[in-house]
Amino acid sequence: MNFSLLLKPVSSACNLTCRYCYYRGEEPPAAGGGSVSPRMSAAVLEATVRAYMQTAQDVYTMVWHGGEPTLLPRSFFAQAVTLQKRCAARGARIANSIQTNGTRISDDLAAFMAHYRFLCGVSLDGPRQMHERFRRAGAGGGTHAAVLAGLARLSRAGVAVNILAVVSAANVGRPVETYRYLKSLGATHIQFVPCVEYDARHKLRAHAITGRQWGRFLVAVFEDWFRHDIGAVSVRLFESVMARLVHDIAIDCYNSAACNRYLVVEHNGDVFPCDFFVRPSHKLGNVLENAFEEMRGSEAYRNFAAGKQRWGAVCAACEFLPLCMGDCPKYRIPAENGAGRTSALCAGWKAFYGQTLGRFQRLADRLKPGVHADPR
């Protein structure tokens, strides 16, 4: 089965101190422009690329993540590309992408990404007041202007960009304003990610959102997108719904049947099944010692993957289960009636699907061969 790699060459090191970061507190922020520790060694990088290229993939997809991967110099990514070319079989297709906070994009790095066709995901939560409420620099300063400057450099270089917006207490009450602002910057690919974090007492953190807020946000964005932007703007979550309705496939983790779409490779070569579960108890092995297929075939990995379908009676009886598949296990909390675990976003998903599914289905019907329907 195809799988991608999410690589963390600097682990959780970052030049920002975003309040909602789920790695917050695990590593001290790296000094701006200073040396980075931890850092993926040349030996781990080569072992990772070589081992991955020995697996059978339709496309070899490597996602450079963090922390903040651009703390590393361009030469690191150039070495990665060189290794990919050296280790790949003739005709192999390779796709690189990088997820960045956008504050450290130089013209040189942008030109490199354009030349090697890196997809660049940039984190931007909306206008300055929304974005900077939780996304702050290491010294507490603003970050919005630096992100816009990075986006401008990427645009001039011709890099394909995907905007990733975290939906938090900062912007959840202003969905259309957030969406239209991102569009005004020229964004044609947008991904919304819910902020769901709990404290040690299992109380929702101040920056996090409730399921009902998530639902209202999605419905409002959908209404605006449906009126004005079908075919012009790709909202990842909407594409995910369409992929399920048209092709009966999952293109995202949250609505997949199993948690087995990718592996995480830490800076030291340790491998984990998911970025939300980088814990000693979930370690599958190390690229210096274990093959990827060995780790994917392990009982620990199979049990983790199968956990996606360990939902309770609430999910099993839900008409929308084929669309959300119980949501990401990270978001699951004990159901109030004790009938297993259900997503903290469940109420929002139900509201969203309940108000939009009919129109999604008409859009899907229009895309199916031999069917002609008015999506509106």
Region locations from a protein language model:
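Extended hydrophobic secondary-structure segments that form protein cores and membrane-embedded regions
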Residues: 5-7, 61-67, 95-100, 235-237
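Cysteine-centered iron-sulfur cluster-binding motifs in ferredoxin-type domains/subunits
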Residues: 10-17, 68-71, 259, 315-317, ...
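Radical SAM/AdoMet-radical enzyme domain recognition
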Residues: 45, 49-50, 54-63, 72-195
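Radical SAM enzyme [4Fe-4S]-AdoMet core and its adjacent flexible, acidic
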Residues: 133, 137-145, 152-254, 258, ...
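Flexible mid-to-C-terminal extensions adjoining Fe-S/redox cofactors in radical SAM and related proteins
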Residues: 278-376
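Short, ordered coil/turn segments that flank beta-strands lining enzyme active or ligand-binding pockets
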Residues: 267
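Canonical Radical SAM [4Fe-4S] cluster-binding loop centered on the CxxxCxxC motif
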Residues: 4-43
